[in-house]
């Protein structure tokens, strides 16, 4: 179990990337310093993902 203190931590680390891969969506930065960049993750409400018009 690599550097984990218990089996629960090891199990969570193993499934985390799978959850993001299967359930995740991509969001693109449309303004600010990271304009054009992309992040992939699991969002609570992906249909209303947005930020202030001035960017993030």
UniProtKB/Swiss-Prot annotation:
InterPro entries in the cross-refs: Phage_Head-Tail_Connect_sf
- Top-rank lineage group of the source organism: Viruses
Keywords from the UniProt entry: Capsid protein, Virion
Q: Report if keyword Calcium is assigned.
A: no
What residue ranges are annotated as transmembrane? none
Major place of localization? virion
The listed locations are: Virion
One Gene Ontology cellular component: viral capsid
Q: Please give the function described in this protein's UniProt entry.
A: Is needed for attachment of the tail to the head.
Q: What is this protein called?
A: Tail attachment protein
Q: Which organism is it from?
A: Enterobacteria phage P21
Name of encoding gene: 8
């Amino acid at each position: 179990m690599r550097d984990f203190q218990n089996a629960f931590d090891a199990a969570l680390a193993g499934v985390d990337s799978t959850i993001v891969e299967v359930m995740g969506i991509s969001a693109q930065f449309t303004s600010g310093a990271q304009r054009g960049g992309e992040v992939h993750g699991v969002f609570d409400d992906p249909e209303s993902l947005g930020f202030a018009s001035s960017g993030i």
